Amino acid sequence: MSDLVNKKFPAGDYKFQYIAISQSDADSESCKMPQTVEWSKLISENKKVIITGAPAAFSPTCTVSHIPGYINYLDELVKEKEVDQVIVVTVDNPFANQAWAKSLGVKDTTHIKFASDPGCAFTKSIGFELAVGDGVYWSGRWAMVVENGIVTYAAKETNPGTDVTVSSVESVLAHL
């Protein structure tokens, strides 16, 4: 577990971008313009938020083992666990994230958003980045639960290339 637990969510001045998907355009190849959201606003407007970081859209572990769990359990998270938002964070651009979300079967972003963290700024601020080259950073594989503005769970995988343990939806469910 991280030293972020039991502390106020570290929103700072960080923002993310995502592209909304609705039932009417879920099967279309059209693309909308990205929306920019301040982390502080998202956290203040929602009582319970799950945030999970993934190294790369369309990568094998992210696409097969990590993110599908959140999509498969979304109804349970929202209806039974009263989660307001699930945010999937990568450093990929919002267009790639939207295409990835659609490829995973997301048809509505009311409760799940695929967020772009430009320059890995937010992820680096919480210490969950993954150095992949000379000054190049991706998001590590991690998960966080924020309830009423307080971090109640935060953990990062030690081997983000293959492991999906502390960042899995099952691990998050155990901490709700």
UniProtKB/Swiss-Prot annotation:
Assigned GO CC terms: cytoplasm; cytosol; mitochondrion; peroxisome; plasma membrane
Matches recorded under CDD domains: PRX5_like
Subcellular location: Cytoplasm
Superkingdom field: Eukaryota
Family label: Belongs to the peroxiredoxin family. Prx5 subfamily.
GO-annotated molecular function: thioredoxin peroxidase activity
Protein name as catalogued: Peroxiredoxin AHP1
